[in-house]
């Protein structure tokens, strides 16, 4: 029986100094090894829709969050090109292609507001 990865997406935040709104992600996303999955992050025209400043973080249990994507689609040095970011309107997305066991983690998005 094929096993599935469970990619939890439980926490989102806006990072502006006066931000009150929250971004919306699915509670969980799952996929099988080798598949591609996309995690959405929906905001408003005041945050995600207005700025190309969405960041995505990966966090494994007991570890510090790791920056995976910044400014919507840029990857820091050392981050696999299996991770990609995009945006359409008020929704940003993180796509992970060729899922691997080590991709099982929490993924957080944040946006300037």
From Swiss-Prot:
One of its GO terms (molecular function) is antigen binding. InterPro entries: Ig-like_dom (IPR007110), Ig-like_dom_sf (IPR036179), Ig-like_fold (IPR013783), Ig_sub (IPR003599), Ig_V-set (IPR013106), IgV_Light_Chain (IPR050150). One of its GO terms (biological process) is immune response. GO terms for cellular component: extracellular region; immunoglobulin complex; plasma membrane. Disulfide bonds join 41-109. The modification Pyrrolidone carboxylic acid is found at residue 20. Its main location: secreted. Residues 78-92 have a biased composition (Polar residues). Residues 1-19 form the signal peptide. Residues 71-73 are annotated as: Complementarity-determining-2. SUPFAM superfamilies: Immunoglobulin. Residues 45-53 are annotated as: Complementarity-determining-1. Keywords: Adaptive immunity, Cell membrane, Disulfide bond, Immunity, Immunoglobulin, Immunoglobulin domain, Membrane, Pyrrolidone carboxylic acid, Secreted, Signal. It is found in: Secreted; Cell membrane. Residues 110-113 are annotated as: Complementarity-determining-3. Residues 20-44 are annotated as: Framework-1. Residues 54-70 are annotated as: Framework-2. Residues 73-92 are annotated as: Disordered. Residues 74-109 are annotated as: Framework-3. It comes from the Eukaryota. Residues 20-113 form the Ig-like domain. Immunoglobulins are composed of two identical heavy chains and two identical light chains; disulfide-linked. V region of the variable domain of immunoglobulin light chains that participates in the antigen recognition. Immunoglobulins, also known as antibodies, are membrane-bound or secreted glycoproteins produced by B lymphocytes. In the recognition phase of humoral immunity, the membrane-bound immunoglobulins serve as receptors which, upon binding of a specific antigen, trigger the clonal expansion and differentiation of B lymphocytes into immunoglobulins-secreting plasma cells. This is Immunoglobulin lambda variable 2-23. It comes from Homo sapiens (Human).
């Amino acid at each position: 029986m094929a096993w599935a990865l469970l990619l939890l997406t439980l926490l989102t935040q806006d990072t502006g100094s006066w931000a009150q709104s929250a971004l919306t992600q699915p509670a969980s996303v799952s996929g099988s090894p080798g598949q591609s999955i996309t995690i959405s992050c929906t905001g408003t025209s005041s945050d995600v829709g207005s700025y190309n400043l969405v960041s995505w973080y990966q966090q494994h249990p007991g570890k510090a969050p790791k920056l995976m994507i910044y400014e919507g689609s840029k990857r820091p040095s050392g981050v696999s090109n299996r991770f990609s970011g995009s945006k359409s309107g008020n929704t940003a997305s993180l796509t992970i292609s060729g899922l691997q066991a080590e991709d099982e983690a929490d993924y957080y998005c944040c946006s300037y507001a």
